[in-house]
Amino acid sequence: MTGSQVIDAEEDRHKLVVEYKDALQPADFYHNFKQRGIRSVQLIPYLEFDDRGDLTAASVTAELWGKFLIALFECWVRADISRISIELFDATLQKWCGSENPQPRCDCQACDWHRLCPHARQETPDSVLCAGYQAFYSYSAPHMRVMRDLIKQHRSPMELMTMLR
């Protein structure tokens, strides 16, 4: 895969590290793993800090992470709902359908998206990507709402792909 690494494959879920250079070409990244037959993905943003605590050049920034997730979501929502499992997208839809999150961290409680965000309960370096996750949650909300409503009507969320054509 161009720039990305498969660092672990438990059963069918592939953990893919997304470096800065990968995040610049989200459509290529998506089509590359799709073409390789990978159908279940966990995206791991590459974060490396220098001695001063700043992100290194190879790291994904919050802004780029958000743009990457949105572009990947656009590829997925238009062609591959229920065909390709992207853990973040699946987890977000589950939250829209009523799955509960544990109590968020104090610094996340004011965020409009804390109920969706898996990082709101962890003290992790991923918090440097909050703005990126917020951009993704905001962008994907209308689509998630439609898929949630389809599921509540005992219909397939795949119907959204037809609606978007």
From Swiss-Prot:
This is Uncharacterized protein YidF. It comes from the Bacteria. The gene is yidF. GO terms for molecular function: oxidoreductase activity.
